[in-house]
């Protein structure tokens, strides 16, 4: 009788969904109040003027205007601000 012993089971075969992080509105783009600018883990980008920071470090616009990226301070941190159009 042609039989084959059953193969063992594996503990692999899972993968998590992508988190969809990153910059959603780039420099010079127009935004409305409440628009998400960056989704991030930790503060890769810091909130500048007219930008709020959510509990998961998501940066969002507090007013309407244009997105502006800038590097400031002694530690060369990246700040995102909203400037009036």
Curated annotation (Swiss-Prot):
* Keywords, comma-separated and alphabetical: Ribonucleoprotein, Ribosomal protein
Could you name the domain of life of the organism this protein comes from? Bacteria
Record GO terms (molecular function): structural constituent of ribosome
- Stretches with biased composition (Polar residues): 9-19
Q: Which family does it belong to?
A: Belongs to the bacterial ribosomal protein bL27 family.
This chain belongs to the protein called Large ribosomal subunit protein bL27
Instruction: Provide a GO CC annotation, any one.
Output: cytosolic large ribosomal subunit
Pfam families named among the record's database cross-references: Ribosomal_L27
Instruction: Give GO BP annotations, semicolon-separated.
Output: translation
Q: Does the keyword Membrane apply?
A: no
Query: Residues annotated as region Disordered?
Result: 1-21
Keyword Ribosomal protein (UniProt): yes
Record-linked InterPro entries: Ribosomal_bL27, Ribosomal_bL27_CS
């Amino acid at each position: 009788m042609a039989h084959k012993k059953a193969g063992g089971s594996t503990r692999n075969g899972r993968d998590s969904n992508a988190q969809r992080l990153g910059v959603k509105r780039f420099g010079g783009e127009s935004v409305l109040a409440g628009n998400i600018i960056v989704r991030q883990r930790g503060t890769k980008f810091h909130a500048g003027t007219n930008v709020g920071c959510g509990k998961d470090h998501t940066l969002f616009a507090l007013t309407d205007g244009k997105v502006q990226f800038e590097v400031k301070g002694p530690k060369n941190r990246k700040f995102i601000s909203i400037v009036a159009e």
